[in-house]
Protein backbone atom coordinates (compact mmCIF):
# COMPACT_ATOMS: atom_id res chain seq x y z
CA UNK A 1 0.00 0.00 0.00
CA UNK A 2 1.25 3.48 -0.79
CA UNK A 3 1.02 6.05 2.01
CA UNK A 4 0.51 9.73 1.24
CA UNK A 5 -0.81 11.05 4.59
CA UNK A 6 -1.57 10.08 8.19
CA UNK A 7 -5.09 8.93 7.27
CA UNK A 8 -3.52 6.33 4.95
CA UNK A 9 -1.47 5.07 7.91
CA UNK A 10 -4.61 4.65 10.04
CA UNK A 11 -6.26 2.80 7.14
CA UNK A 12 -3.23 0.52 6.70
CA UNK A 13 -3.24 -0.33 10.41
CA UNK A 14 -7.02 -0.93 10.44
CA UNK A 15 -6.66 -3.32 7.50
CA UNK A 16 -3.44 -4.86 8.89
CA UNK A 17 -1.50 -4.17 5.70
CA UNK A 18 1.89 -5.83 6.03
CA UNK A 19 3.97 -3.86 3.51
CA UNK A 20 3.88 -0.14 2.79
CA UNK A 21 5.74 2.46 0.74
CA UNK A 22 5.59 6.01 2.07
CA UNK A 23 5.54 8.80 -0.51
CA UNK A 24 5.17 11.65 2.02
CA UNK A 25 8.71 12.67 3.03
CA UNK A 26 7.80 13.83 6.55
CA UNK A 27 5.84 10.69 7.37
CA UNK A 28 8.52 8.51 5.77
CA UNK A 29 11.23 10.18 7.83
CA UNK A 30 9.10 9.85 10.97
CA UNK A 31 8.75 6.11 10.24
CA UNK A 32 12.52 5.83 9.83
CA UNK A 33 13.12 7.58 13.15
CA UNK A 34 10.42 5.50 14.87
CA UNK A 35 12.07 2.36 13.51
CA UNK A 36 15.40 3.42 15.03
CA UNK A 37 13.69 3.94 18.40
CA UNK A 38 11.84 0.60 18.22
CA UNK A 39 15.06 -1.25 17.38
CA UNK A 40 16.91 0.37 20.28
CA UNK A 41 19.26 2.25 17.97
CA UNK A 42 18.00 5.66 19.12
CA UNK A 43 16.92 6.43 22.69
CA UNK A 44 13.33 7.69 22.90
CA UNK A 45 14.52 10.50 25.17
CA UNK A 46 16.22 12.06 22.13
CA UNK A 47 12.78 12.63 20.54
CA UNK A 48 11.56 14.29 23.74
CA UNK A 49 14.55 16.62 23.76
CA UNK A 50 14.08 17.51 20.09
CA UNK A 51 10.39 18.28 20.72
CA UNK A 52 11.48 20.77 23.40
CA UNK A 53 14.76 22.17 22.15
CA UNK A 54 14.89 22.19 18.37
CA UNK A 55 16.48 20.10 15.68
CA UNK A 56 19.28 17.64 15.07
CA UNK A 57 20.46 15.33 12.31
CA UNK A 58 20.01 11.58 12.67
CA UNK A 59 21.51 8.79 10.60
CA UNK A 60 18.74 6.39 9.59
CA UNK A 61 20.81 3.88 7.63
CA UNK A 62 22.11 3.29 4.12
CA UNK A 63 24.09 6.54 4.32
CA UNK A 64 20.96 8.68 4.76
CA UNK A 65 21.08 11.43 7.39
CA UNK A 66 17.88 13.40 7.96
CA UNK A 67 17.19 16.63 9.85
CA UNK A 68 14.75 15.96 12.67
CA UNK A 69 12.66 19.00 13.62
CA UNK A 70 10.16 19.44 16.43
CA UNK A 71 7.33 18.56 14.04
CA UNK A 72 9.03 15.41 12.80
CA UNK A 73 9.81 14.35 16.38
CA UNK A 74 6.15 14.86 17.32
CA UNK A 75 5.01 12.78 14.33
CA UNK A 76 7.47 10.00 15.21
CA UNK A 77 6.26 10.06 18.82
CA UNK A 78 2.62 9.76 17.70
CA UNK A 79 3.54 6.82 15.48
CA UNK A 80 5.37 5.09 18.33
CA UNK A 81 2.36 5.54 20.62
CA UNK A 82 0.05 4.06 17.97
CA UNK A 83 2.47 1.16 17.43
CA UNK A 84 2.64 0.47 21.17
CA UNK A 85 -1.16 0.60 21.53
CA UNK A 86 -1.65 -1.95 18.73
CA UNK A 87 1.48 -4.05 19.46
CA UNK A 88 2.91 -3.19 16.05
CA UNK A 89 6.53 -3.64 15.09
CA UNK A 90 7.96 -2.03 11.98
CA UNK A 91 10.85 -3.25 9.90
CA UNK A 92 12.66 -0.95 7.51
CA UNK A 93 12.95 -2.85 4.23
CA UNK A 94 14.51 -0.02 2.22
CA UNK A 95 15.61 3.32 3.70
CA UNK A 96 15.91 5.41 0.52
CA UNK A 97 12.66 4.06 -0.95
CA UNK A 98 10.91 4.33 2.42
CA UNK A 99 9.62 0.76 2.23
CA UNK A 100 8.47 -0.82 5.49
CA UNK A 101 7.12 -4.14 6.67
CA UNK A 102 4.60 -4.07 9.50
CA UNK A 103 4.14 -6.90 12.00
CA UNK A 104 0.98 -6.99 14.11
CA UNK A 105 0.63 -8.42 17.60
CA UNK A 106 4.32 -9.00 18.12
Positions of PLM-derived features:
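Acidic, low-complexity, intrinsically disordered interaction modules
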Residues: 58-64, 68, 72, 76
